[in-house]
């Protein structure tokens, strides 16, 4: 594996849930736009030139073209390439067209140094859970096979393993085991990152690091049997990818984003 490249910084944000108009999407929630703006301001201040910002799904609560355009306006403050995925709340076709028309990536692959970043579409029309279609699974394998000298990071919206919250584990990636079985066949796959769970997660499947990310909006209570909110700050994940295949990561919580209604 070549090691002549510099290290790569990738930032993950997820589950922005922008509504039809700025403001809370439901009672007790903070303003989705204000939360996102605070996260992006912090991100831009803390990281002046990331190599890529990945937005891993549930981009919109109301999946309409003007909402995705408003999200893109928010993201325009970032001095970095952007790639996104659809989640269960999104309209994949509208979201994809909006991002591509704006010059950003959606699904697909991107080479950064000697790393290959792959976005997998797990959106499944009519379902809260996710599905990696046979076409997507084959695309992922083909992409990895075309880059035998690159380390691999896979991004998907739905969690590929149970995360310890019963209600969330029922709506994860329905064929996550199949995806992981395929990824395990390729020694250069180092990590799989995901959104959907509105909380940090850090686990392993064999040699593959599995990482979940806080939402820019509200957080879900870890280890909860039923839906429950956690009064924690919004956040994002920082990933540092090294030429030798090492990965370092941390979650950044953004001061001032703790939902007031959940802490009173």
Regions found by a protein language model. Give the residues of each.
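His/acidic metal-ligating clusters that form di-metal
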Residues: 38-52, 129-211, 245-248, 257, ...
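N-terminal active-site segment of His-dependent metallophosphoesterases
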Residues: 1-70, 146, 163
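Active-site-proximal beta-strand elements of phosphoester/diester hydrolases
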Residues: 7-21, 114-124, 153-155, 208-214, ...
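Metal-dependent catalytic neighborhoods of phosphoester/phosphodiester hydrolases
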Residues: 55-76, 91-104, 130, 165-167, ...
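A short, structured active-site edge motif that brings together acidic residues
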Residues: 82-93
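Acidic/histidine-rich helix-loop elements
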Residues: 14-35, 61, 91-104, 125-134, ...
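Active-site glycine-centered loops adjacent to acidic/histidine catalytic or metal-binding residues
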Residues: 15, 57-58, 87, 120, ...
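Binuclear metal-dependent phosphoesterase catalytic core
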Residues: 30, 182, 201-264
């Amino acid at each position: 594996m070549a090691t002549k490249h510099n290290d790569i910084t990738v930032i993950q944000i997820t589950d922005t849930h922008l509504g039809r108009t700025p403001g809370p999407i439901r009672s007790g929630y903070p303003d989705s736009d204000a939360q996102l703006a605070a996260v992006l301001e912090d991100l831009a201040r803390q990281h002046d030139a990331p190599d890529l910002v990945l937005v891993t799904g549930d981009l919109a609560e109301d999946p309409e073209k003007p909402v995705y355009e408003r999200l893109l306006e928010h993201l325009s403050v970032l001095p970095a390439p952007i790639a996104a995925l659809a989640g269960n709340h999104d309209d994949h076709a509208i979201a994809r067209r909006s991002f591509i028309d704006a010059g950003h990536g959606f699904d697909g692959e991107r080479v950064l140094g000697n790393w290959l970043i792959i976005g997998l579409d797990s959106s499944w029309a009519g379902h809260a859970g996710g599905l990696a279609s046979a076409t997507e699974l084959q695309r992922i394998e083909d992409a990895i096979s075309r880059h035998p000298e690159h380390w691999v990071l896979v991004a998907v919206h739905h969690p590929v393993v149970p995360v310890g919250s019963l209600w969330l584990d029922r709506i994860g990636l329905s064929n996550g085991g199949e995806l992981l079985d395929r990824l395990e066949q390729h020694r250069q796959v180092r990590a799989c990152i995901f959104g959907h769970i509105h909380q940090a997660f850090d686990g392993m499947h064999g040699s593959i690091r599995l990482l979940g990310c806080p939402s820019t909006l509200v957080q879900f209570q870890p280890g909860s049997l039923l839906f429950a909110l956690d009064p924690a700050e919004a956040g994002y994940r920082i990933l540092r990818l090294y030429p030798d295949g090492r990965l370092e990561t941390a979650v950044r919580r953004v001061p001032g984003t703790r939902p007031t209604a959940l802490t009173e």
